[in-house]
Swiss-Prot record:
Induction entry: Expression is induced in biofilm.
Gene Ontology molecular function terms on file: DNA-binding transcription factor activity; DNA-binding transcription factor activity, RNA polymerase II-specific; transcription cis-regulatory region binding; zinc ion binding
UniProt protein name: Transcriptional regulator WAR1
Signal peptide: none
Compositionally biased tracts (Low complexity): 19-38, 129-142
Function according to Swiss-Prot or TrEMBL: Transcription factor required for yeast cell adherence to silicone substrate. Plays a role in resistance to weak organic acids such as acetate and sorbate. Binds in vitro to a nitric oxide-responsive element (NORE) but seems not to be involved in response to nitrosative stress.
Summary of the knockout phenotype: Leads to sensitivity to weak organic acids and decreases cell adherence to silicone substrate.
Subunit and interaction comment: Homodimer.
Any one GO cellular component localisation term in the record: nucleus
GO annotation (BP), single: positive regulation of cell adhesion involved in single-species biofilm formation
DNA-binding region listed in the record: 54-86
Coiled coil ranges: none
Length: 947
């Protein structure tokens, strides 16, 4: 708000200072300048108020009267009387004059100058410019000439009031003109430590020196130009001086730069950058030429495909393409290849995918030369590795090629040379880089040296690309679980979108792929929720509600699997077993009974493992040879888990039902082992089947060795199976009867023609098969009849609903329980031990079961004679104990693996997931661990830490 309007008649009255001509340029006088009158000297001069009141008078809305009538910029009367500083706020609201009034005031001021000359030696002049001059000075604030007129910087803050202090001098000669009036008002004093700022345009007497006014506008313009040149020279000298002293040339304090960014500052920055910069186009062209030359040197006239290199002929390539289309892709439609395309055309258009397809066909190639098969694998690996890692090509064809190599990985290698996880990592990176996720891609235009965004390909939204996304996901999940690493692939919303679209597809292959991806997603969740937090020192265990919810999700997926899809059913049950895998650190505690939760967990896990092996056993050898990598890894895990549970149940000190993990587990694993062996014999170049056989045999040998050691530690009778006092008396009576019969007959007590007579733990566990005795004894047959009658008195499992353990602990009925009571297991050995004080060396005993296939002997699963075994002697690591003696049963010792073979086999495989199932004890002996994690594996997680 403006102050009180001037009194009537103030227009005709002037202050004494007006007689000297200072009223013309007084900005604090709100009245317009008027011509002087002749009779003004006769009238008494009237004190006028200031146009801009001080803060105190403005707040009280009263007239602000200067204490010195000759100096309107002097402190007002009220502030002097109140003994306070008179401050003027230039930003306070005031009533603006109309533009027409401003123009009229300027016109009148221009007319009054010729009539009234200014006094040349006036000690003081008006201290304020008019408001219109103030506006023009603000509009010209970006001009560098206005910011360089002062030797020392002025402090100016538009938002703070101005305090009047003595005036500072200036060494720069001013220019006196109508555009730049001079005054004698006090100026602010610069304060050290405060950055230089623009001086207030309302302060007066800033410029001193020559007050000669120009005679015309042209002269005034020339003077302004000379002044600008002078200031530029002065600024350049200051910059040069600062550079010599070592100061930075962009320091505003040292160079007294203005508080705003001036034109000179921007031009200076651009000139600095331009001096040290080259053209962007030149640099781009230079780098592009070097990159093109590098690629030319790498791929200069070198063939890529196997036909051009002469590894295989065109006829062999056509045969392999037919095998892939009809058998591999026909049973597992994952990576499609063009139909009706000949080998020559395929190898020229997509050489890397062609090489990968040729390598995948090695799984079922029967009559090929071994060196040719290995050369195909090496060339397929070399071609994609050079193209990606050396040349730097990124294409969808390479993604497909890496996917085929990951799905049908068939390289004969030890764990130190394994590469399937590296292939998978490159495949994941390529999938991101090629822009399948609708990410824009760019290409370099060498003609004009620019980068242009490629047009979005319509094919990136088709089903083929969605298949690649899902395939890459579940291969990554399987690979990470095999290597015991955190799964770095995530089920993102885009993956969910791809899976949903394929689930609703009209093609059966798309729906099957989506179903398998869903199953792996549940496997991923189970790993992160149930098993990933299980590390040493952390609290393990998941609530029963979470287990039930995950089981419900799995059951929903099972409804979508057909009954004849044995491979999918086997994979499903392996995931279910992984879900219910018991926390062994809580289950297997010494001198404790299993609680209901542990019993249920073991029962569910065992049932799922058996179902997985049963479904896998329904496959033919040819179907097993065609299974991709994820299926075989889950079967190996399931077999190892089942054998570990079986042994740990046998070795528990608590008296529980040993059929909680039934002996059928051993026969099922042996059946799977024979099936894999048969498939490997039919397909000798399928090295992945050879590795599966090796892993399964490693589990079986470890189990057999530990059971024999368990027998040795407990006098050929495990502590769990030792009878109590009442049973001992019965055994003594049977021993006396046995001695009487032996003295009469002088023949063996028991014939090997019995269908099922488990006389020791290995026979009871069905892990060994003995040869039948061709000359059974009639006396032994009569004694066997008496023993059978005694068995019926004790109750066989077929007559009762419970299995009677050594200490008569009732447990629930278990399917496929042994046909004879367990109390008869240690009868002969224990009774003879009681009588004679030592163990009896009995003849080999047979375990015949007409309902199950003949069991395969341990240690005879060897590669074909045409395939030499690698030398594992350099990898000697902890092996089975050599202190266990098998003198009582030399045939068992012959059927067991050589300790050196066992330790070498363990070294070949000890860096993968089965290391969690096997471990070494304090004596460096391989055994089934009683933990869900291997203590040494926590150091393996360096960058792949659990999330």
């Amino acid at each position: 708000m403006s102050d009180t309007t001037p009194e009537k008649g103030s227009v005709d009255s002037v202050s004494p200072s007006a007689s000297n001509g200072s009223n013309t340029n007084n900005p604090l006088n709100n009245s317009s300048p008027q011509p002087l009158k002749s009779n003004e000297s006769d009238k008494k001069p009237k004190v006028t108020r200031r146009s801009v009141a001080c803060k105190s008078c403005h707040s009280l809305k009263v007239k602000c009267t200067p204490s010195d009538p000759n100096n309107p910029s002097a402190p007002c009367v009220r502030c002097i009387n109140a003994n306070r500083i008179c401050e003027i706020d230039l930003n306070q609201t005031r009533k603006r004059r109309k533009k027409s009034e401003i123009l009229e005031a300027k016109r009148q001021a221009g007319q009054s100058l010729p009539e009234h000359k200014k006094e040349k030696n006036t000690p003081t002049q008006s201290g304020y410019n008019s408001s219109e001059n103030y506006s023009s000075s603000i509009n010209n604030a970006n001009d560098s000439s206005l910011t360089s007129r002062y030797q020392s910087p002025m402090t100016f803050d538009p938002t703070s009031p101005m305090v009047f202090r003595p005036q500072a001098s200036s060494a720069v000669p001013p220019i006196s003109s109508n555009l730049n009036p001079q005054s004698a008002a006090p100026t602010p004093i610069p304060t050290s430590g405060i950055p230089p700022q623009l001086p207030s345009p309302h302060e007066s007497a800033i410029l001193r020196g020559n007050t000669t006014s120009p005679t015309s506008k042209d002269d005034e313009i020339n003077q302004l130009k000379q002044r600008v040149r002078f200031l530029e020279t002065e600024l350049a000298n200051k910059r040069l001086l600062a550079n010599k002293k070592g100061f930075s040339n962009d320091s505003p304090t040292d160079l007294q730069s203005p508080p705003f960014v001036s034109k000179f500052d921007l031009e200076s920055e651009i000139s600095i950058l331009a001096e040290s910069s080259a053209r962007l186009t030149d640099l781009t062209n230079q780098l592009n030429e070097a990159a093109s030359r590098r690629i030319q040197l790498v791929s200069a006239k070198k063939p890529v495909d196997l036909i051009s290199k002469g590894v295989i002929t065109v006829a062999e390539a056509e045969e392999r393409l037919k095998l892939y289309r009809e058998q591999i892709y026909g049973r597992h439609p994952l990576i499609a290849i063009p139909d009706n395309m000949h080998a020559i055309e395929f190898s020229q258009s997509q050489p890397f995918l062609f090489n990968s397809i040729m390598s995948a066909c090695n799984l079922i190639t029967k009559n090929a030369d071994k060196d040719v098969v290995l050369a195909i694998d090496n060339e397929a690996m070399t071609s994609v590795a050079v193209e990606v890692m050396v040349v730097g090509t990124k294409s969808v064809e390479l993604v497909k090629a890496f996917s085929v190599l990951c799905l049908y990985y068939n390289s004969p290698e030890l764990f130190k040379q394994r590469r399937y996880h590296m292939l998978n990592t490159i495949c994941v990176s390529l999938l991101h880089d090629v822009g399948i996720f609708a990410r824009p891609t760019y290409s370099y235009n060498q003609a004009d040296g620019t980068l242009k965004q490629d047009a979005s390909s319509k094919d990136k939204g088709n089903d083929e690309y969605r298949e690649l996304v899902l395939i890459t996901y579940f291969v990554t999940v399987s690979t990470c679980l095999v290597l015991r690493r955190s799964i770095y692939a995530r089920w993102t919303p885009y993956v969910e979108e791809c899976c949903s679209l394929l689930e609703n597809s009209s093609q059966e292959k798309h729906r099957r792929l989506a179903l398998f991806a869903r199953m792996n997603n549940k496997l991923d969740k189970i790993h992160h929720i149930v098993h990933a937090p299980e590390m040493p020192g952390q609290k393990s265990g998941v609530s029963q509600y979470v287990i039930q919810e995950l089981q419900r999700l799995l059951s929903d997926l099972k409804l979508k699997i057909k009954d004849n899809q044995y491979s999918l059913l086997s994979y499903y049950y392996s995931i279910e077993a992984y879900l219910h895998e018991p926390i062994l650190t809580k289950v297997f505690k010494s001198d404790t009974e299993l609680d209901g939760k542990a019993m249920k967990s073991i029962r569910y896990c065992t049932s799922s493992c058996l179902n997985a092996l049963d479904e896998y056993s329904k496959l033919t050898p040819d179907q097993i040879a065609l299974l991709p990598f994820p299926f075989g890894s889950r079967i190996m895990y399931t077999a190892g888990m089942l054998l570990r549970l079986r042994y740990l149940i046998l070795s528990l000190p608590s008296h529980i039902d040993k059929e909680l993990v039934p002996k059928r587990a051993v026969t099922s694993i042996q059946c799977v082992s024979k099936l894999v062996e048969q498939a490997n014999i039919l397909n000798p170049h399928n090295h992945y089947l050879t590795k599966m056989r090796l892993v399964l045999q490693l589990f079986i040998q470890t189990y057999a060795t530990q059971v024999l050691e368990l027998l040795s530690k407990n006098g050929n009778t495990p502590q769990n199976f030792k009878p109590d006092e009442s049973e001992t008396q019965q055994l003594r009576a049977l021993a006396r009867e046995y001695n009487d019969i032996r003295k009469v007959s002088k023949v063996s007590l028991v014939s090997d023609t019995r269908s099922a007579e488990p006389l020791d733990v290995l026979s009871y566990a069905a892990t060994f098969r003995r040869e039948n005795n061709d000359k059974p004894s009639a006396v032994a047959g009569s004694l066997r009849k008496s023993f059978s009658e005694n068995d019926q008195a004790i109750k066989t499992p077929s007559q009762c609903g419970q299995f009677v353990s050594a200490n008569n602990t009732p447990v629930p009925q278990v399917i496929n329980s042994p046909p004879i009571s367990q109390t008869n297991v240690p009868v002969l050995h224990q009774s003879q031990s009681i009588i004679n004080g030592n163990n009896r060396n009995s003849a080999p005993l047979a375990f015949n079961n007409t309902t199950t296939p003949s069991l395969h002997q341990f240690g005879d699963v060897l590669p074909p004679s045409s395939m030499p075994q690698p030398d594992y002697r350099q990898f000697r690591l902890p092996s089975i104990s050599n202190t266990v003696h098998y003198s009582s049963n030399p045939r068992l010792n012959a059927n067991l693996a050589n300790p050196d073979q066992l330790e070498n086999s363990y070294q070949v495989l000890n860096d993968e997931f089965w290391s969690n199932l096997l471990s070494t004890d304090s004596t460096d002996r391989i055994n089934f661990t009683s933990n869900n994690f291997n203590g040494n594996t926590s150091n393996d997680e360096v960058f792949f830490m659990n999330n």
